[in-house]
């Protein structure tokens, strides 16, 4: 279980890093955060509220209308990701979900659902990384007018 969470976290961190930095092309930095990286916030929210609220509290604090919030969960049922997407909806954000074959719980919370048709955790995670790279490449092309 810990390894699965670590890889999902890695996908989020890579996506944020490539948006702030770059994937391939020189361009302006873009605002992006991986909500898993601030251990003080994660620990405080988990202790004071619950682990299921670690993303929702951050989304409430940082998200506004028109922002894009991406939830990544191989199972499609992670309570913390689901609550984070609900909070994003309340804030007026566009919600994107990356998940595996099980979409029943997450589908109603996503404006855009990208579901990998597999129940194999490793394959789902690998595709999530690929989708992050494709997204960053498309963003770079758009910014550069291609």
What do these predicted ranges mean?
Residues 1-63:
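Glycine-rich, small/polar surface segments that engage phosphate groups of diverse ligands
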Residues 9-13, 77-84, 106:
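Short glycine/serine/threonine-rich phosphate/pyrophosphate-binding segments
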Residues 98-110:
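Short, glycine/polar-rich helix-capping loops at beta-to-alpha or helix-loop-helix junctions
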Residues 69, 95, 113-114:
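Short, well-ordered beta-strand core segments
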Residues 61, 122-146:
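A charged, well-structured terminal subsegment
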Residues 36, 73, 99, 114-122:
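Short beta->alpha connector loops at strand-helix junctions that form conserved
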